[in-house]
Amino acid sequence: MPRLFAAALTLTLTFTLTAADWPQFRGPARDGVSKEKGLLQSWPDGGPPLAWTAKGLGGGYSTVSVSGDRIYTLGNKGSDSHVVALNRADGAVLWTAAVGPAGGSLGCTPTVDGGRVYALGQMGHLVCIDKDGKRVWQRDLHKEFGGKKGGWNYCESPLLDGDRVIVTPGGTEATMLALDKATGKEVWRCPIATRHTEAGYSSVVVATVGGIRHYVQLFNGGLVGVSTDGKVLWTFEKLGGNTANVPTPIVMGDHIFSSIGYGRGASLLHLTAENGRITVREVYYARELTNKHGGVIQVGDYVYGDTDDSGRPYCAEVKTGKVIWKRGDEGTGGGSASVTFADRRLYFHYDNGTVALVDPSPGGYREVGSFTPPRRNGSSWAHPVVCDGRLYVREGDLLYCYDVRAKQ
């Protein structure tokens, strides 16, 4: 495994951003890892200082994207889902723009490129919206491309790659789809012949193996690799047919780590390229490494994530799948935990609202601070985001912004 622990993912996605941006779900590299330094390594009692609170986001579990002087998220308001734009400085709502009909708990996160925002609604309406909240174009994944959503509708965050938008309608006609990001016109569609064809709730990532750059996605048919011109390169159906496949895969050089929930577990795959083809070998299958929807983070030689949705995070060795530790009764959070990483620390957002700062040590689960936001609205499933010295925590209609910069 000579390249397993190399720089995990080098995305050449075309974003107009600064080093202080977080323009899409799980950040610039879609791995949940921030490159920031100079952050608090522990928190005082009560947590870090609260910079501001925003309200009026609507219902749902979507997290935020941060770009320039704006923050974007999605929320259900009445019978429709909306993109919500906020001022980055104080959280003031600047505008809202309808995406399409609401359908249950909204979990998609907008993707931002310069002055345009791309968002997918629960019922399959994919929209491009300009910086003033005006719709540039819209496509319907179900009606136009034969899309087949899962039981909780769509929950994907669009991928921007160069001049294209990549999404996963599901179904047999266009299981994966590429559109021109400027016009919304179809570039290619890729039918994927697996036993289960419903869209999952994961988001597409980019992998390059042996010079072959391609898209990797976890949907209800399992894992798939699709070329940049829309051809199926490989499939791995062992993880298919689940109640819901949610966590976004982690690209680790020529390896793919993918965890799913409902007691199923995780697989590490080794990809080999030869003569323009990619072959896949399963390195291991680890039933203990389940994860429903909180995501998994790679830090060095280890991966960290919640065990299914139990509120019992684990640390496991990447190369073997061996569990090094699993949280017991220590710590403060409870229920499903989503996670991000910044400046040598894990940030867990638990279902009971608790936000915990954790030292990612293979020696055990060790919190170095925790707090609970003042108010909550139902389950706390939105992934935390750390960007430009700020920690963003979504609680339904509310967004909290905390200052996590270390004092000089």
Where is each model-derived feature located?
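N-terminal secretory signal peptides that target proteins for export/translocation
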Residues: 1-2
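Noncatalytic, solvent-exposed loop/strand surfaces
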Residues: 17-408
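Bacterial N-terminal signal peptides
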Residues: 6-16
